Amino acid sequence: MVLGCPKREAVKEFGVQCLKQENVCPIITSRNQTHTHTHITISSSLTLHNGGLSLQKIIMGKTSKWFRSLLTGKKERTKEHIIQSECVFTSSIPGTPKEKRRWSFRRSSATGPPPPACAITLKDSPPPPPPPPPPPPLQQPFVVEIVDNEDEQIKNVSAEEIEEFAAIKIQACYRSHLARKALRALKGLVKLQALVRGHLVRKQATATLRCMQALITLQAKAREQRIRMIGGDSTNPRTSIHKTRINNFYHENEENIKIVEMDIQSKMYSPAPSALTEMSPRAYSSHFEDCNSFNTAQSSPQCFSRFKEYYNGDTLSSYDYPLFPNYMANTQSSKAKARSQSAPKQRPPEIYEKQMSGRRRSSMEAPRNNGVPRAVRMQRSSSQLGSNTAKESQQHHHHQYYPWMAIKLDRSNISLMESECGSTSTVMTNTNYGRHVDVQGNNNMY
């Protein structure tokens, strides 16, 4: 049943007093008893509606007891004590009370919001614990914030810095391209140089091998020709002709020596002297000793080697006797040196002393030649002239092939010219002829 206005005011006053004393909202639970005993169930809720405090109380039970307790106020203390004990009990044992059937004039909890739960505490109760800290935020929003910050920083970068960074990157790429290009060109150049050098080296090696082969073949041919010349002298017709001419020349020289000896033996029978004086036997002997010594000097190793070089190198090569190839012939300078070393320089001192002694003897024995018959001397001179004229044709051929013979004739004729003899004309003819042959021989040498 709904209370009237005076009852509402009384209830309001009671609620205000309770709030002032304990500052809590009293919640009185009901106890249902069986049979006829019932208690009063009071549910109170404090709500702020239109700026004022509205206290609603629904009283169920017997009205008589309620009015008595309300008017008399005897049992207020006992009720307060019961309420405090029940509040402590409920606070110590938290739990959800079982829902029971009760009479209520308010809206159900399903339709309306639940009433606020007010904690009933005592004055001596400890303060409530502090609230727990809030949970940490998730990582995903943090990452998003970092990305957002970077984007903001990039946006804040000036346009000049972006252009500079792009230019540096382009330059780096272009320089790397140029470096690769230069490296490829250098590799190609090195390969080309290696190919060219290898070709040149191979070409030079082949040229040297060909030259060596040509030299070896030339040396072999030269050796074969030398062996043939050494072993085939007897079969060569020209060498046989030269040998016969040399033998004839030596035989003629021996005959001339014999004629001179016969004239010397017949000079004892000449009564009167003549203008054409002859040589003494000592002069002749000294003259022929000089010739023999000259021959021995020519047969010495040095002179023989030079004669051999001259004979083999010049005469035989000029008359188709190639002991040496054409490229090994003597030059003009070497021939001039050989010509400068002529026979008078090569004459040994002993021969020169013998010639001087022979001249002195001839000068001392010149008066003795006056006793030689004039006819014999003339005959000998005429015989010498005839023999010389007969020999010219043969000696010409000999001097063409053997110019060294002119040197011997020249020396022998000079010694005869210096001696006192009657055949001066023959001596002069022989010397002139020897000089003429010597000049021809030297011309043939060149």
UniProtKB/Swiss-Prot annotation:
Compositional bias (Pro residues): 125-139
Chief location of this protein within or outside the cell: cytoplasm
GO term, biological process aspect, one: trichome branching
Start-end of Low complexity biased regions: 332-345
SUPFAM superfamilies in UniProt: Formin homology 2 domain (FH2 domain)
Region annotation Calmodulin-binding: where it falls in the sequence: 214-231
Biased composition (Polar residues): 379-392
InterPro entries found in the cross-reference section: DUF4005, IQ_motif_EF-hand-BS
GO molecular function ontology, one term from the record: calmodulin binding
Keywords from the UniProt entry: Calmodulin-binding, Cell membrane, Cytoplasm, Cytoskeleton, Membrane, Repeat
Membrane listed as a keyword: yes
Gene Ontology cellular-component annotations: cytoplasm; cytoskeleton; plasma membrane
Record-annotated IQ domain positions: 163-191, 192-214
A Pfam entry, by short name: DUF4005
Subcellular localization, as worded in the UniProt entry: Cytoplasm, Cytoskeleton; Cell membrane
Knockout or disruption consequences: Reduced trichome branch number.
Region of interest: Disordered: 93-140, 332-398
Misc: 'Furca' means two-pronged fork in Latin.
Stated role: May be involved in cooperative interactions with calmodulins or calmodulin-like proteins. Recruits calmodulin proteins to microtubules, thus being a potential scaffold in cellular signaling and trafficking. Acts as a positive regulator of trichome branch initiation. May associate with nucleic acids and regulate gene expression at the transcriptional or post-transcriptional level.
Oligomer and partners: Binds to multiple calmodulin (CaM) in the presence of Ca(2+) and CaM-like proteins.
Family recorded in the similarity comment: Belongs to the IQD family.
Protein name: Protein IQ-DOMAIN 19
Top-level taxonomy: Eukaryota, Viridiplantae, Streptophyta, Embryophyta, Tracheophyta
Gene that encodes the chain: IQD19
